[in-house]
């Protein structure tokens, strides 16, 4: 059990009983990102303790998320072209539950990278992605305010949620950057190929001109 009762019937968390996992030793860059965010095992514990409230309200959270996306027609078009709202709702529910599972490991990170590549592939602009995550953060903060009375635990839970959402966004934005870099490399390669073709064509013309003379 996560909770014990004090004499005044106030629920407090028995933190020692909460099992979480933060392991990313195979990826030094990701490990550095997590260190810079200050995302710790204690944060994962706060997320896991709060998961029952998230699970209880997950339908409303996801509905609000997609209602907000529905305000932008280009996003609706992207969704309808590549999937459906109902399918994506199931995916988002699973995604959110994993965020509050208390586990961040290589598998967690690889899943995020895969999702990021999908976002890039379907043409989801970064401004919409960031805006959508901001709406999630507001929803989570309101949920914390409604369910946690203790000031310190409330602050730590909100901080943990902010960190995990920031980490998720970093993974996606990094994938966008990689795509842009690859596109720039391809453009430079095309420029070189065109330049070489022009030089070769000029050389051939010069050779033909000399033969004619």
Annotate each predicted stretch with a short phrase:
Residues 43, 47, 154, 191-194, ...:
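Disorder-to-helix initiation segments
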Residues 1-45:
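Charged, compositionally biased N-terminal leader segments and the immediate start
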Residues 170-213:
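Long cytosolic alpha-helical coiled-coil signaling stalks of chemosensory transducers
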Residues 59, 63, 134, 138, ...:
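Generic detection of well-ordered alpha-helical segments
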């Amino acid at each position: 059990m996560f909770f014990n009762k004090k004499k005044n019937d106030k629920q407090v968390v028995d933190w020692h009983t909460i099992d979480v996992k933060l392991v990313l030793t195979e990826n030094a860059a990701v490990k550095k990102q997590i260190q810079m965010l200050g995302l710790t095992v204690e944060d994962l514990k706060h997320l896991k303790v709060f998961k029952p409230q998230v699970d209880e309200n997950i339908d409303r959270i996801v509905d609000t998320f997609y209602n907000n996306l529905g305000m932008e027609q280009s996003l609706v078009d992207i969704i309808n072209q590549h999937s459906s709202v109902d399918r994506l709702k199931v995916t988002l529910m699973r995604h959110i539950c994993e965020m509050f599972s208390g586990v961040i490991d290589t598998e967690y990170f690889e899943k995020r990278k895969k999702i990021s590549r999908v976002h890039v592939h379907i043409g989801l602009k970064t401004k919409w992605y960031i805006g959508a995550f901001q709406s999630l953060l507001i929803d989570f903060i309101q949920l914390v305010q409604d369910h946690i009375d203790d000031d310190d635990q409330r602050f730590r839970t909100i901080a943990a949620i902010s960190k995990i959402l920031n980490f998720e966004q970093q993974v996606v934005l990094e994938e966008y950057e990689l795509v842009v870099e690859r596109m720039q490399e391809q453009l430079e390669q095309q420029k070189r190929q065109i330049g070489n073709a022009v030089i070769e064509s000029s050389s051939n013309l010069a050779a033909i001109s000399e033969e004619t003379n």
